[in-house]
Curated annotation (Swiss-Prot):
The lineage of its organism: Archaea, Thermoproteota, Thermoprotei, Sulfolobales, Sulfolobaceae. Mg(2+) 1 binds at Q282, E296. This is Carbamoyl phosphate synthase large chain. HAMAP family: CPSase_L_chain_A. Belongs to the CarB family.
Length: 1051
């Protein structure tokens, strides 16, 4: 008999960080849906304001609080749930669940853990317990020993024998893990590894050099029935974190014996931890014989399970939630197929490729080599019917300016064979580009295998693409058969046109004349063997007919956000999903085009039709040819839609909302600056970078510092503050590289100004706007800034002038839909610095803070007009809301932590409060590794900017109970100083509770900042924020823990 709980608490994962991203928005949303179907009341704790999950429609009650045990205890005390789900919020949620269990909170309030129990979680996540469990069950694991101290680690590594893989228990994204080739390597890094473990434990394991890494996804119910859902093959060998690896599904190089043996072991691993729900099991396979080891398991929804779910069409998170409620596999219907029960193992008639997306160029000093720690910030997934087609599509999806395996910047560079092999040996990101270059320059398969350990099967495929492309280049014209073969191998129109030295339009014309167009295929989990009710599709040239009939009517295609990177994250998926829902009121059919496996928008039951495919002019035009969409919406998915808007419009596509020509004016720095001059709106002095002579003259006239700003970029890519001529010339060179087709603008950088923004919606005549004020001064990228609603320091007069400016721009550009305007305010003058004619990164926050969905309002503005009498309307604020940035410094090996005009954060959290400090502190505490400092500990406060704020910060921290030191080389008035060496020593000894600093001081304090983030010590990189947070510490006892609607927020 199944006992259904009446109220269930679901723990989210908090803000997006490297290794814990939007996959938990997807999995948590599915879990909440599964609970709702059962009539169960749901309560969600999650501080990630950007997610779809933290919209009211998913959970009955939402608490936007730090995802830590003491905050969750307050919710349990108030809500009294019967059950708790901790398997849908990543490692963060599991850690909270274990803490609540150990501290007796679950027992005290009689809350039952649903799904895999705590002892099973501990068996899986403690490296020592996992090893013991596997050995007890006669399951093969590599030779290894655990350790809980530096001395024990050094002793046990000698027993295991070098090289050793250091694995970290209860850990996220391999943080702190490494391969130690010698004792010296181990001694240098073992303290950091132990610091990154939630329980202070590591495993020293024999390093399996160049072994193949594989993952299996398994479902298991309370009766022990199991179904293996996917086998995923990592192309990168052991030693590269699976989140950093290019992977394919189904596995391509296993024989039946290998596949079946590991499948059996997977089921045994699930049984040994008494899994209820879903887990993934990772294996190492000897490429030269039938020898395999079990490496680890994650007893929760994970990045891999999100990928497996999207790759197979099997709704893992939904089914897992049902199993946690006590269902058996045969009782749950697979909602994607609509025909089969959850015990059916999927069958695939296509190949899926996942490639991670890195943004390492944004960080100074970061280690560029891929290793055991995850550094990628997002991923893409492509679907094709040949490996070549799937791989080339995935490379284009990365949006890194490469058209596929061949024909791009790397392939056409002057790099020699030796240089390409060197990059491959160093494990640089996007290895397939260097492999293709090496083959082009004459490298053999064996030479590339020796430096990479990548299976020869895949290397042969890449070499085949190189050979085909070189043959293509020798042709003057292309015949129908060669063109069809090229398309089947995944070549884009752009690649083919480059090879033939023709235009893209020429290739498209021949394609249409020869009827060489892709066909639409369904993902149904059943390889077409059973009829299915799915709406989940992709396009391929390896097919002869479409799997669907295309409907007529008033139809909308929404362009998704693509793969996440710094600057494009889950907030744009929120916009896409909001637009889907709003659009269904105005269109007969709404479809979405996206290729991110982590997101809610690519879930099977969100869109009427989901096209899991490339976002490009070529693909959109192909889809319009088939589907006859009346409109295409490019404004909800971040920069990627805006980048193709103008070209789509030039090809006859009707854009929803603001015109492509208006978007071009906003995105092109020179055109936008001229528009502001025409309207008489204040902006910093500027010049378009046409010659070095003019730039030099301008800089001398306005004085340094100046800001270098490329066009059509996101997250401040290559945006730099230049303090000298030398820096100016270097930054202009970089900016023209990143955005060569568009002008680079140099403007006067206004120091010590307040930065503010308006998120808004217009119908071309009226404006609905929300004002956000930054705590940090102008010069810190808005994506890294802490934001407050309502504003605090701006005067009403300034805000009214900002609103007036916005209204004038909206009317001049005939803005129809969402937009965001950024201002700097100095001496009572607001200066406009940027306009984005699309949904903004802050829109989920501003919408939830005010209780009004700006994307829904956008659709009303476009079709019905805004329905208020004023020209400009801002909804009133009922309470305070504060948004904080989440940084992932600890994952980015070697990176120097500092803030500037280029974005560095990976996610965001928000909280609400009855006072500004109530909201600020909960918001700040929601970002890892921030915590309330232990009184009687040490704080370091120093810097070369915002010195008055740093001094006041030091005073506040002293009042809080900390011993505060400044550094003698950068003293603060009346604050005790220590020298730099002593400061480093205190940080390494983990005696420092918090660091507050400001300014770019890499030559001086690199070791202090880097060691702090390696050891999980909270660090605040701005004096103004440090002051406000330190003041909030003094009000710690008055924090409130209300449900979001009690603060008047939520949508």
């Amino acid at each position: 008999m199944r006992e259904t709980p009446k109220k269930v608490l679901v723990i989210g994962s908090g803000p997006i960080k490297i290794a814990e991203a939007a996959e938990f928005d997807y999995s948590g949303s599915q879990a909440l849906k599964a609970l709702k179907e059962e009539g169960i009341e749901t309560v969600l704790v999650n501080s990630n304001v950007a997610t779809v999950q933290t919209s009211k429609k998913f959970a009955d009650k939402l608490y936007m609080l730090p995802v830590v045990w003491w905050a969750v205890e307050k919710v349990i005390e108030k809500e009294r749930p019967d059950g708790i789900m901790i398997g849908f919020g990543g490692q963060t949620a599991l850690n909270v669940g274990v803490d609540l269990h150990k501290k007796g909170v679950l027992q005290k309030y009689n809350v039952k853990v649903l799904g895999t129990q705590i002892d099973g979680i501990e068996k899986a996540l403690s490296r020592e317990k996992f090893r013991e469990t596997m050995i007890e069950n006669n399951l093969p694991v590599p030779p290894s020993l655990s350790a809980r101290s530096e001395e024990e680690a050094i002793k046990n590594a000698k027993i295991v024998g070098y090289p050793v893989m250091v694995r970290v228990s209860f850990n996220l994204g391999g943080r702190g893990s490494m391969v130690a080739w010698t004792e010296e390597d181990l001694k240098k890094n073992i303290r950091r590894a132990l610091s990154q473990s939630y329980i202070g434990e590591v495993l020293l394991e024999k390093y399996l050099y160049h072994w193949i890494e594989l993952e299996y996804e398994v479902m298991r119910d309370k009766k022990g029935n199991s179904a293996v859902i996917a086998c995923i093959e990592n192309l990168d060998p052991m030693g590269v974190h699976t989140g950093e690896s290019t992977v394919v599904a189904p596995c391509q190089t296993l024989d039946n014996l290998e596949y079946q043996n590991m499948r059996t072991y997977t089921i045994e691993v699930a049984r040994s931890i008494n899994l209820i729900g879903e887990c993934n099991v990772q294996f190492a396979l000897n490429p030269r014989g039938y020898e395999y080891y079990i490496i680890e398991t994650n007893p929760r929804m994970s990045r891999s399970s999100a990928l497996a779910s999207k790759a197979t069409g099997y709704p893992l998170a939904y089914v897992s939630a049902k199993l946690a409620l006590g269902y058996e596999l045969h009782e749950v219907i697979n909602k994607v197929s609509g025909r089969t029960c959850a015990c059916f193992e999927p069958s695939l008639d296509y190949i899926v490729t996942k490639i991670p997306r890195w943004d390492l160029s944004k960080f100074e000093n970061v280690d560029q080599s891929l290793a055991t720690e995850m550094m990628s910030v997002g991923e893409v997934m492509s679907i094709g019917r040949s490996f070549e087609e799937s791989l080339q599509k995935a490379i284009r999806m990365l949006d890194i300016g490469e058209p596929g395996v061949v024909g791009g910047k790397v392939y056409e560079s002057n790099m020699s064979k030796e240089e390409a092999l060197k990059y491959l040996k160093e494990r640089r990101p996007y290895w397939f580009l260097y492999a293709a270059k090496a083959f082009k320059e004459g490298a053999t398969i064996n030479e590339v295998y020796e430096v990479t350990g990548i299976n020869e099967f895949f290397l042969n495929k890449i070499k085949g693409l190189v050979d085909f492309y070189e043959t293509l280049r020798k042709l003057k014209e292309i015949d129908k058969e060669t063109l069809k073969l090229a398309k089947k191998l995944g070549f884009s129109d752009e690649q083919i046109s480059k090879a033939l030295n023709k235009s893209t339009e020429y290739v498209r014309k021949i394609r249409y004349e020869t009827n060489t167009i892709p066909v639409v295929k369904l993902i149904d989990t059943l390889a077409g063997e059973w009829p299915a009710v799915t709406n989940y599709m992709y396009l391929t040239y390896n097919g002869t007919e479409d799997d669907i009939e295309f409907s007529q009517g008033n139809k909308l295609l929404i362009i998704g956000a693509g793969g996440f990177r710094i600057g494009v994250s889950v907030e744009f998926d929120w916009s896409v999903v909001s637009l889907m829902e709003a659009g269904s009121k105005y269109f007969d059919e709404v479809a979405v085009l996206n290729y991110n496996p982590e997101t809610v928008s690519t879930d099977w039951d969100i869109a009427r039709k989901l096209y899991f495919d490339e976002i490009s002019v070529e693909r959109v035009l192909d889809l319009i040819k088939k589907e006859k969409f009346r409109y295409v919406a490019t404004f909800s998915g971040g920069q990627i839609g805006n980048s193709i808007a103008k070209e789509l419009e030039e090809n006859g596509v009707r854009l929803l909302g603001t015109s492509g020509s208006s978007v071009d004016i906003a995105e092109n720095r020179e055109k936008f600056s001229k528009l502001l001059d025409k309207l008489g709106i204040s902006q910093p002095d500027w010049i378009s970078a046409t010659s070095l002579g003019e730039i030099k003259k301008f800089a001398n006239e306005v004085g340094f510092p100046v800001l270098v700003r490329p066009s059509y970029v996101l997250s401040g890519s290559s945006m730099k503050i230049a303090y000298s001529e030398e820096e100016l010339y270097e930054y202009v060179r970089r900016a023209t590289e990143i955005s060569p087709k568009y002008p680079v603008v140099i403007s006067k950088y206004i120091e010590n100004a307040i930065e503010a923004e308006i998120d808004g919606v217009s119908d071309g005549n009226k404006v609905l706007g929300i004002t956000l004020e930054h705590i940090e001064e102008a010069g810190v990228h808005s994506g890294d800034a802490t934001m407050s609603i309502p504003f605090r320091k701006l005067s009403e007069n300034n805000v009214n002038r900002m609103r007036e400016n916005v209204l004038n721009i909206a009317r001049e550009l005939n803005i129809k839909g969402p937009f965001n305007v950024q201002f700097v305010v100095k001496e009572n003058t607001p200066y406009i610095i940027e306009l984005n004619l699309r949904a903004s990164r802050s829109m989920p926050f501003s919408s939830k803070a005010k209780g009004i969905n700006l994307i829904n309002e956008s659709m009303k503005a476009i079709f019905d007009g805004l329905d208020f009498s004023e020209d400009y309307y801002e909804p009133p604020s009922k309470y305070w809301a504060v948004k904080s940035a989440q940084f992932s410094w600890s994952q980015l090996r070697g990176a120097y932590p500092f803030l500037g005009p280029e974005m560095k954060s990976t996610g965001e959290a928000a909280s609400f409060g009855v006072t500004f400090y109530d909201a600020l502190l909960k918001s700040w505490l929601s970002s890892m590794p921030n915590r309330i400092p232990n009184k009687n500990g040490i704080a370091l406060v120093y810097g070369n900017k915002n010195l008055d704020y740093l001094k006041d910060t030091a005073d506040n921290l002293t009042r809080f109970g900390l011993t505060v030191y400044s550094i003698s080389e950068l003293p603060l008035q009346d604050i005790e100083t220590i020298d730099k060496m002593k400061a480093e020593e205190l940080v390494r000894a983990k005696k420092v509770e918090i660091i507050v600093t400001d300014g770019y001081l890499k030559k001086f304090d690199y070791n202090i900042r880097r060691t702090a983030v390696d050891y999980n010590i909270p660090i605040i990189l701005n004096g103004r924020l440090g002051y406000e947070v330190s003041k909030a510490f003094l009000n710690y006892d008055s924090l409130t823990f209300f449900e979001i609607s009690e603060y008047g927020g939520g949508i």
